[in-house]
Amino acid sequence: SAASDVYKRQCINTVYKVQMEGLMRLKAMAKINLGLDVLGKREDGYHEVRMIMQTIRMYDILDIRKTRRPGIVLTTNLPFIPTDQRNLVYKAAQMLMEEFDVEEGLSIKLRKFIPVAAGMAGGSSDAAAAFVGVNRMFHLGLTEEQLMERAVKVGADVPYCIMRGTALAEGIGEKLTRLPEVPKCYVLIGKPGINVSTKTAYENLNLEGIGKHPDIDGLIGAIRNNDLYAMASRMENVFEPGIIRQYPVIGNIKNLMEEKGALKAVMSGSGPTVFGIFDNRDKMAAAARSLRKSGLAKTVFATDIYNRDGGVTNDK
C-alpha cells in the first residue's frame, strides 16, 4: 500500500543520510528515560521494569565499509573501548553476518560522543546502528521488526534503539509500545565525572522501601495530551534517591538545572547522567553556561528530542 511504502521510505531515511561510494554512515542516538519504575525482581534474577524511553539528538557515528577480506575490523576513537566480541557493535554485526553466511568482510569505524556508562544506552544504540547498517549494506532484506527480534539477544535496550522515538518499555525492557511523540522541548545533559554501574543502582534499590512509585501511567497520559508541563511534573526515576545518597553531586546538578529554569531535572537510567527539560532554548543555553561554570558536570551537552517522524506529528 502507499502508506506502507511511505513508512518504509521513512525507515530507510531515518538514519542514513550519507551514502558515499561504498561507505555508509549511521547515527547512533542516545536515549533518556522520562520515567523509570522497577516493579520487582523475577525468578531469573532480572528486574521487571516500566519506563518511558525517549531518543535525543546526541549521537555516536558509525562508518561502515565492505572489505574483500572476510571478518570484522572494528576501530574506535577511544582507547579503552574493546574492539572484539566484547563490543556490542561487533556482536551485532557478527550475529547477522553469520546467520546470512555473508562472504565479504566489514570495516566499522565507531566514533563515540555519547558518554560511556552514563545511563544513555550509548552501547546499545551503537549495536542498533550496526544491525541496521549490516542489513542494508548486504541487502539482507530484514524488516525493522525482524531486526528487533534479533537485537534483544545482544541487549535489552537494543530493540528500542532500533525503533527510536518515544516508547513504553516493559518486562526487562524488551516489551515495547510506541507512544505519540512528546511535545517540543529542549534537553540539557549533565554527566558528573563518576560512573555508576547498573548493578550498583539495583543493589541500592530497596524495593520494599519505595513509598510512592513513579506515575508512569500519568506520564503516558500527559504525553498523549501533548502537555509538556504535565509531562515534566511527572518525570521520575525510582533509582534516583538511592544513587543521590551515594553520589550527592547528582543531586547538585539536578538542583542547579531546576534553579536555572528547567521544568524538571531527572537522573537518566541507572545514572549518573542528569537531564533537564526546558521549554525555551535560550533558558537552556544559560543553564548550560552555569553548569559548565559550576564544574559539577564533566560533560555538558545542550540538545533537543528526536522524533521518529521528523517533527511531523502523526499519532498512529
Per-region residue spans from a language model:
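Short, small-residue-biased leader/transition segments that mark boundaries at the very start
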Residues: 1-7
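ATP-binding N-lobe of GHMP and related small-molecule kinases
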Residues: 19-118, 136, 140-145, 172, ...
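ATP-dependent small-molecule kinase catalytic core of the GHMP/sugar-kinase superfamily
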Residues: 22-27, 35-37, 41-51, 140-264, ...
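Short, basic/glycine-rich phosphate-binding loops at helix/coil junctions
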Residues: 68-82, 130, 225-235
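Glycine/serine-rich anion-binding loops at beta->alpha junctions
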Residues: 109-138, 156, 263-278
